[in-house]
Amino acid sequence: MRISRFLQTPFISYEDKNMIYIEVAEWDMCNPYEVNIFVDGELVFGEKIFASSFSAMIPCYDEERVATVSITPFEDTPVDKDFLVVPQKHWEIPLLYSSHEDLGYCAYIEKLHYECYEYLKKAIELCQKHESFKYMIEHYWWLDAFDSYATDNEKALLKKLFAEKKIDLSATHSGVHTSWASSEQLARGMYFGCQEAKEKYGISPKCAFYVDLSGASWSVVNCFAKIGIKYIGILANSFRNSKPNTDIPPLFWWQDLSGKERVLLWNQRSYRQHGLDGIWCDTLRQYPEGSFYFDTTKMLKTERWFSERISQIEPCAYDILPISFYDDRESPTTMLLTVCEEMNKKWKYPKFTMEIPSVFMSRLEEKYGESIPTLRGDISDQWADFATIAPRWMSNKRKATRMLYDIEMLSTIDSVVNRAKYNQKTFRDIYFKLCEFDEHCWATSSKHPQKMHRHNIEKVKRDTVESSVFELEKMRASLCPKADNGEEISIISTIPQGRKNHIYGKKGELVPKELKHQILPNGAVVTEAIELGGVGAIRAKGILPYKESIEIDADFIETDFYKIRVSRQTKRIVSLIDKESGAEYIDSQARFELGQFVYAYAEQKTDPNLSFEIPKKTDFKLYEGEVAFALTQKGYEEQSGAIINTQFVFYKHERTIDVDLSYENATGLIGDFYDRYKKNYFFAFPLKLENPEFYTELHAGEKKEGRDYIPLSANDFSVTQNWVAVDGENRGVAIYTRDMPVFHLGSIKYNRFNRDFSENKAHIYLYASSNRCNNLIYTSVEECQAKYYLSILLYNGKHDDIVPTWSNENDHGLIVSKQSILNGCMMRLDKGNIRLVSLKRSEKESDAVVLRFVETEGKETECGLELFFNPTKAVYARNDEIDLEEITGLKDNIIHFNAQPYSYTTIKVYGDFEI
């Protein structure tokens, strides 16, 4: 016989004895054997054993000792082996019990509100009945549901339990994909859980937990820290874990891009801790209250599980091991409380408790502080490419966020200058809806009953954005009414920096008479560029556009910046040369063409071996007008049934290249019950650069692919705010995307599941569509279509001080209106690297407006802001509008403030304009 394992466990009895596990090999399984354990020559354990593994209790020691384990087989000689016994920690095991509901997944959305109320009411009752019961509300949406039905007494009880730290609130709106939010929405989405929850229930949340998501945008660190959030929780995602697996600590300081802010992040292994779920819930997934049992078998298995888990993380500095154990749509019960009580009856340590995150995360911070490792980088949320399953809805959502910026700004100026009504509740409700749209559960694949899931996905997703856009368009019609032909018009800019851009509109909308214009083949109208000095407007006489694009028979065109050659035989662009550098930008050796539709599909949903189909070309034309050259391509892809239309616009006097892409009749997306990601559409942009380095825009700043990444999950796609860029040696290319924010960079790499990013080709692929959830969305020919608007910029040098400004001008194009509340230049910012993301009225102070900015180039910057009124006071504020220090040196309508690199800066400005 031999001893095959010696494990010192964390379990300490009330007699101060430490439990150890011993496993033996080559036992005859017929006769007992004798075991004696000696420490410093003293016998501390002696028994006869009839098992291949057993536990033994030995004294606890304050310093390392050598334990000699002596095994004497039946009628044989002893076998001795020495093991090191170390002082054992007094472990704490806080168990996190949380609500969890995927919006639109588990119940009809109209019924879910009341279910949330019922579940939270039950949790309140258990907190009152049991002193040690603790519970977390996973997000504000759940609290809002409770608030809709609760009595005044129930609300008072909840407020009391918040104060007693028996119930916690995660400050998130819901389980949102943070990368889908605009820069302003990322902050405004926290107003609900911070501002409104504090006003109603007196709680100031310290944690933001994504209880069913594998990551969050790097920008949440800076944004949330400036709202008072100190702790973030995410969840491991077993389906798309990165390969090779990496040793990322489960607890670390997550530092922002600026290096000045950080939050403490806990990466939960799962929300029903793997291994424990099979022990505690061995006969039922969820036990109704009063039916859970914790017998000797469960006790022994629990002891073994925690012994193994702690042995995996030792040696370490910690003695606190938080464990998540909650489930989808679970009515609160005392199951975890029973586990804690039974374990604590038997064992002095570890100490098992039910605890809320703001308490145990605070304990970890206080106890270990600077010894906790610090990591920097983005953490991919590996379901964020769900955006591709409903491209038309995603396009509408992104349209709403752009409109919100413009309309909220114009409404604020109108309310200050003209004392007009300000629709604060409308803006609040729209942001609430957009956060609902971003909620992570899109009823993945087709679940039963399909009728319910289709109903929910239309309510939670489609209807939220359609109703938001409808409200915003009504407000825009009031603020920016349309003019009749020949009337004076205003050309409005909502960007506080000077700019020179063309107007991009629709046929039938007026354009300035003195500007050259052109109706493009797809019906859009463009003008030559016009210059504006900041937020403001200029007046001009308006006319209906009438100058059509004329088809030309050429295979070579030239603008001020580019030389473009086409092949009419192969119906494609074959050369794109930058005149300044003389460099060719199209990779002629690439598999796909510039702007080409690519149908990528797999036989199995996780198969990394993709097959590719490209369209047959049916038409190719080249047009010219006063402003630009336009190239149109049409094609038909047989396998998917997609009819594809493409339009490139090369402006004669601008570097920007506009691209309109669309497909329709893609009925191949219909079908494939339950399969994920088998059918995918991309548009290819195979560019040619030396030693390419890829960059993706974040809410505040950017990430360099392959460097700024914490590899907790696979790095196969990128979700941008608005642009991606690839720098070469001395030049580069950027793509602005209006409708779809998901890209594959370097290559199409679906199901590769690799954490590494190593690409030597400057190829960019817009991930346009996927058939996941197809039985819920792609159910008719009408649904199987989408449109995408992109802009391409070829630049010399690096992207840093060029692309962010260019992208922002694309995102907030010039507005044409019959009249404008703006007169001349009314607001101007003197630095180009500071992007205004919001101008709004204060939520609480009727005599204040709030401006929020993000820095885009990684530079600490002092800014001068010229306002449209004379302020009486200005302060820096948290991102939830709580005043911080005062800004000094106000002069007339000028404010000077400081902005940190890649950071949010919020200022609140007071004036004599109370409504």
Predicted segments with their positions:
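CE4/NodB-like, metal-dependent polysaccharide N-deacetylase domain
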Residues: 187-220, 226, 305-323
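C-terminal (or distal) subdomains of carbohydrate-active enzymes
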Residues: 11-16, 220-225, 235, 239, ...
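An acidic-aromatic substrate-binding cleft motif
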Residues: 78-116, 125-126, 133, 173, ...
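Short, solvent-exposed turn/loop segments enriched in Gly/Ser/Thr/Pro and often Arg
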Residues: 97, 136-146, 172-175, 208-217, ...
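Catalytic grooves of carbohydrate-active enzymes
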Residues: 100, 230, 259-479, 636, ...
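Acidic, His- and aromatic-enriched active-site or binding-groove loops in soluble protein domains
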Residues: 153-171, 221-261
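Metal-dependent polysaccharide deacetylase catalytic core of the NodB/CE4 family, i.e.
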Residues: 103, 131-133, 137-211, 260-269
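Mature N-terminal, pre-catalytic/accessory segment of carbohydrate-active enzymes
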Residues: 1-102, 110, 900, 911-915
